[in-house]
Amino acid sequence: LKTMAPSALRTSGRRRSKGVVAAVVVAGLALTGCTSTNTDDDSSLLQTLQERGSVTVGFAGEAPYSFMENGELTGATVALHREIFGNLGIETVEGVNADFGALIPGLQANRFDVVSAGMSILPERCEQAAFSEPEFNYTTALMVEEGNPMNLTDMQSVADSGARLATMTGAIESDYATELGIDSMQVATPQDGMDAVTSGRADVFALTGISLNWMKNNNPDAPVEVTQSFVAEINGVPQVGAGGTVFRTDDKDLLDAYNEELAKITSDPEKYLSIVGEFGFTEEELPDPELTTADLCAGAE
């Protein structure tokens, strides 16, 4: 693998019927109430969760990764967690909703056990938390007004055109904008980004292609379209995108056990697609086995 300076790189089965997703705690209650994780000095988090039989995940409501639908927590990362944690003897997945930018702080504050958001593995994030091995490859896309009147195709075209850009707070696209000198409008959720475009407050909303296409397909009457997905480039350097589950750095036993189960899924394309395919994921999103979390945390391509 070719290496580069960390600042140069920016990275944005069977279903277990007993892997029940339990009630979701609203963000306000979760942020002010008691913590979700209580371990004694002699027990690892893995042991505690196995004894409890449940794991609490932080999520930001970004479809199709982790979101609420008909009162239940669902999505590709949730499906992976049902499978993996179920195989570890942890049968129930509970969710705490939080803004994307509050997920790692919430994890550090013990408000949930792991983050289930398909979060991009970035060097600066690796300084704050531990990541699983990659679960998804990422590409970026743009949501624009129907007809794409500004002919926007990638992040550089947004910068060159002076288009008003919306990005989600804490998402990798915000970093792309900063590095390209774009003063982007920050939004809290994907829905807020689409609303910014449809209301005329923004010309374009940048997010992962899988998320934007999911939104468009589920809002067919919205007067927007989604560009072809692309790999963003900053100063001529392709920005390799891969995401994973986030853990506290102290929870190594849980992370190691999780990665062992994850490898059984990502090494088997048929199994991988049987878990995440219903959410619009294809073999294009299957992680490159040559690209590891260690590489991404170090800033290597």
Regions flagged by a language model, labelled:
Residues 82, 95-158:
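Acidic, polar ligand-binding/catalytic clefts
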Residues 137-143, 220-262, 283-300:
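Periplasmic-binding protein-like
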Residues 35, 78-87, 148, 156, ...:
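Extended ligand-binding regions for polar small-molecule ligands
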Residues 42, 93-105, 170, 185-199:
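Short helix-initiation/N-cap motifs at beta->coil->alpha
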Residues 36-40, 172-185, 256-301:
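Ligand-binding clefts/hinges and TM-proximal coupling segments of bilobed small-molecule sensing domains
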Residues 39-117:
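Extracytoplasmic small-molecule ligand-binding "clamshell" domains
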Residues 28-33:
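C-terminal motif of bacterial Sec signal peptides marking the signal peptidase cleavage site
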Residues 119-127, 203-239:
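A ligand-binding cleft/hinge motif common to bilobed small-molecule-binding domains
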